[in-house]
C-alpha cells in the first residue's frame, strides 16, 4: 500500500510565541512525501533541495502518532523531497508533518478530514520537540493555504481568509536558528505588543499585522535591521518569518527587492497560495 502527501511552506503574519495566538499564510514552496507501508521496518531518506537531511525526529514522531491513531502496527519505506530550507523560519517541520500524515493516511486507506490531518501533524511536531507552541497556525497555513489565524494553545482555527496570489520574496540568511534554541527566551515581555498585531490580523488588516509583528520580533531577537529597512524603503510589506532568520517581502516589484537583498544571503521568489 502506497500513499502520497504534500505540505507547503508558509510565512508568518503573527508569531504565536508571545501570546499563543498566531497567523500564517501559505506560500508556493512544497514538501512531498511518498510512503509504502511495510510489516514493521522503517527506512527512507529526506532530501532538502537535493541534499540529504538526516534528522528523522518528525518522521519517527508521525509514525508513532499514526500507529496510535489507526490502531495498526506498521512500518514504512519513505522518501521526502522538500524545497523548503530547514531552520530558517519557513515552516519546514509543519510541511513535513502534514505531508507525511497525509501520505500514511492515504496508504492505509484512512479517510481523515483535513483539520484532523493538521492536528495529528501538530501532535507529532510537539512529540518531536520541533515546536514551542504546537505551530497550529503554521500547520493550517501549510495544509489549507490562505491566511490562517489560530489559537495554538486551544488548537483552534479562529479564522481563515483567502489571499490573492501575490509575489513573495524571501531572504534566507546563512544563519540557522532551530526552535529548540529559543526555549529559555521570555517572549511574555513582548506579549502586549504582539497582541495588538493579532487584533489587526483578525480584523483583516494582515499586512499591517505582519509588518508590526516583524518589527517587534526581529528587534527582540536582535536580528540585523538592514534587510527590513531596505525593503520598507522600497514600499514592500515586510515581515520576519517565524523565529527567523528569514525575512520576506510581499511586493509588486520582486526583482527590486531581490537586488537589494542579495548581499544578505540567498533569495527566493515565490508567491502566496
From Swiss-Prot:
Catalytic activity: shikimate + ATP = 3-phosphoshikimate + ADP + H(+)
GO terms under biological process: amino acid biosynthetic process; aromatic amino acid family biosynthetic process; chorismate biosynthetic process
First-listed, main subcellular location of the protein, grouped into a coarse class: cytoplasm
Pfam families named among the record's database cross-references: GHMP_kinases_C, GHMP_kinases_N
Cellular compartment(s): Cytoplasm
EC number: 2.7.1.71
Keyword Nucleotide-binding: yes
GO molecular function, one term: shikimate kinase activity
Pathway: Metabolic intermediate biosynthesis; chorismate biosynthesis; chorismate from D-erythrose 4-phosphate and phosphoenolpyruvate: step 5/7
InterPro entries for this protein: GHMP_kinase_C_dom (IPR013750), GHMP_kinase_C_sf (IPR036554), GHMP_kinase_N_dom (IPR006204), Ribosomal_Su5_D2-typ_SF (IPR020568), Ribsml_uS5_D2-typ_fold_subgr (IPR014721), SK_arc (IPR010189)
A Gene Ontology term for the protein's cellular component: cytoplasm
List of residues binding ATP: 85-95
Keywords: Amino-acid biosynthesis, Aromatic amino acid biosynthesis, ATP-binding, Cytoplasm, Kinase, Nucleotide-binding, Transferase
Disulphide-bridged cysteine pairs: none
Family that this chain belongs to: Belongs to the GHMP kinase family. Archaeal shikimate kinase subfamily.
PANTHER family associated with the record: HOMOSERINE/4-DIPHOSPHOCYTIDYL-2-C-METHYL-D-ERYTHRITOL KINASE, SHIKIMATE KINASE
Protein name: Shikimate kinase
Organism the protein comes from: Pyrococcus furiosus (strain ATCC 43587 / DSM 3638 / JCM 8422 / Vc1)
Gene label: aroK
Amino acid at each position: 500500500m502506497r500513499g502520497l502527501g504534500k505540505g507547503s511552506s508558509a510565512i508568518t503574519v503573527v508569531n504565536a510565541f508571545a501570546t499563543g495566538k498566531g497567523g500564517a499564510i501559505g506560500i508556493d514552496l512544497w514538501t512531498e512525501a511518498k510512503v509504502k507501508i511495510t510489516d514493521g521496518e522503517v527506512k527512507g531518506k529526506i532530501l532538502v533541495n537535493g541534499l540529504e537531511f538526516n534528522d528523522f525526529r518528525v518522521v519517527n514522531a508521525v509514525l508513532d502518532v499514526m500507529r496510535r491513531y489507526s490502531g495498526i502496527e506498521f512500518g514504512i519505506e519513505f522518501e521526502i523531497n522538500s524545497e523548503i530550507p530547514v531552520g530558517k523560519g519557513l515552516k519546514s517541520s509543519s510541511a513535513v508533518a502534514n505531508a507525511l500524515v497525509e501520505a500514511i493516511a492515504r496508504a492505509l486507506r484512512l479517510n481523515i478530514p483535513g483539520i484532523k490531518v493538521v492536528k495529528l501533524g501538530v501532535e507529532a511536531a510537539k512529540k518531536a520537540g520541533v515546536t514551542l507552541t504546537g505551530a497550529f497556525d503554521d500547520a493550517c497555513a501549510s495544509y489549507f493555504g490562505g491566511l490562517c489565524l489560530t489559537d495554538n494553545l486551544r488548537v483552534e482555527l479562529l479564522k481563515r481568509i483567502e489571499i490573492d496570489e501575490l509575489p513573495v520574496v524571501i531572504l534566507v540568511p546563512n544563519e540557522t536558528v532551530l526552535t529548540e534554541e529559543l526555549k529559555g527566551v521570555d517572549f511574555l515581555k513582548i506579549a502586549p505588543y504582539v497582541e495588538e498585531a493579532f487584533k489587526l490580523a483578525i480584523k483583516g488588516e494582515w499586512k499591517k499585522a505582519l509588518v508590526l509583528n516583524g518589527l517587534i520580533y526581529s528587534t527582540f531577537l536582535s536580528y540585523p535591521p538592514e534587510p527590513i529597512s531596505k525593503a520598507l524603503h522600497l514600499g514592500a510589506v515586510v515581515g520576519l518569518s517565524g523565529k527567523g532568520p528569514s525575512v520576506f517581502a510581499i511586493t509588486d516589484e520582486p526583482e527590486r527587492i531581490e537586488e537589494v537583498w542579495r548581499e544578505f544571503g540567498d533569495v527566493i521568489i515565490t508567491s502566496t497560495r
